[in-house]
């Protein structure tokens, strides 16, 4: 039986991913905080990915599969430049270095499978109608640049034989439950979630903006499928684009109208924001 470690397991996707495993599986979650109402039968480790001692202790248990979900989200990575690079890149490098240390200590016997959640933010415009896995990565944000760096680092550690795994580029997850986060794409969920709860929602872009979405359930499915893949049987650059639903903001709004009516749509307020 392979043990599973979910780094960033306190978040929405991490919690859903953990719940997808049978109770007989050994699952550990590491994060800064966890939902109070969670009844998951898992080991919870409080700590930051930037804390080398906590990471060393956690990895000393030699988990067979590691999902690396932890990150500073796009909006915060842009406004807090140093924090974005420290958490999204430097901490990931430290994590990989510790994986290599465990590999060397075991004389090559320990080679975990690492599934890293990257993002469509690695791409920059202009876009083709269909974006392939090997489309040029030319990010226009710090967050996107940080994700590209992590993809390349992971790919090199895999090439050197220190671990197995791959990076998967998730579309924007929509609709996210709960409160808005600091992601630049948070409004895509907000313009649906808030009106359905009788609350106003800000729309910072024009309604002809087209974006790429996937549901939380789909995201968990992508992660579990990635866990089952044999990297040796694949010929690719180490990162795969995940499928999603492409739609405009206007199409989102019309879908809301068809479900909740005009009164819900009236709660969406256009407030252009070039950021």
Question: What are these regions, as identified by a protein language model?
Answer:
Residues 50, 79, 83-94, 137, ...:
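Glycine-rich NAD(P)-binding loop of the Rossmann-fold in SDR/ketoreductase-type enzymes
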Residues 155-210, 216, 220-221:
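NAD(P)-dependent short-chain dehydrogenase/reductase
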Residues 40-51:
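Rossmann-fold cofactor-recognition segment
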Residues 204-206, 212-275:
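C-terminal substrate-binding subdomain of Rossmann-fold SDR/epimerase-dehydratase oxidoreductases
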Residues 93-140:
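Conserved Rossmann-fold NAD(P)-dependent oxidoreductase catalytic core, especially the SDR/UDP-sugar
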Residues 125, 140-166:
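Active-site Tyr-X1-5-Lys
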Residues 49-87:
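NAD(P)H-binding glycine-rich loop region in Rossmannoid oxidoreductase-like domains
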Residues 4-23:
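N-terminal Rossmann NAD(P)H-binding glycine-rich loop of SDR-like oxidoreductase domains
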